[in-house]
Amino acid sequence: MRGFRWPPPPDGGPRTWGPGPGAPRTGRPALPEPETELVDTPHDVQLERLVTGVGEPVTVFAHGFGNGIATTRPFGSAVTGRRVFFQFRGHGRSDVPPGPWSYLDLARDLRAVADLSGASRAFGASLGAGALCRLLVESPDRFEKLVFLLPAVLDRPRGPIAQQRLTDLLDAVAGGDASAVADVVALELPPSVRNTPAGWSHLRQRLDQLLRDGLAAGLADLVEQSPLPDVAALAGVTAPALVIGCVGDDLHPTHIAAELAAALPAATLHVYDRPGFAWTDRADLRERISTFLND
């Protein structure tokens, strides 16, 4: 890791890795990662979990492909009650059971964590939104409130650009090359953020996590899959839902968010006008999610 040379720190210092003289000399230091636990599930897959907050209600948060607890926590920062974050199989310290894997397997992971935690509300981002959709086909009345952030796929496979991005991430992490991983992860950031202290801190955190924990090869099974046989299968879900999409995101097309909102009888759709809104419109996004869930 000390030989890492990409990208340059935002203050123009030497391109070296770590907390030494090459690290950014501006911006806040990254907070230490909280202590997580491994929980047993009825389907014999141990999953990594973090519980924050106190009281009721309880909200479970499901992360995106190649992401995890750390990148999902900010979305729940203003949500009241207990907040339950976890890692799907193949991510973090969670188990890597034999494959092949499907969205039904992810739905079982999500359902197990929700049941063990007593969650009455659910948040799903990207891959997590797909897993939540699959869970709702089996149990349409499981949750009282639902948030879907950047749904990526419903009843048709991802497009070729999105599939290639996910494959590139898996290949880079498997190869263990920090520069290759950084090239892929940097695409998550809007250009205006990439060479700032905040962007550098995010990139460093993501690289630390991905190169430490890796991503299971079984995740490749999911790249070409879709979670639903037909989006019409969600017609029985009557819980209030918030669906959040954006314009211009190759991994999360606007029409997927619109189709999901149309399929859910009690859904509200909000579409941001550009990718990277989790950075550029962070306060608005946090308020939008918390207002919906806290109401």
Kindly give the residue locations of the regions a language model identified.
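Short beta-strand/loop motif that positions the catalytic acidic residue
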Residues: 237, 243-245
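Flexible "cap/lid" loop of the alpha/beta hydrolase fold
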Residues: 133-173
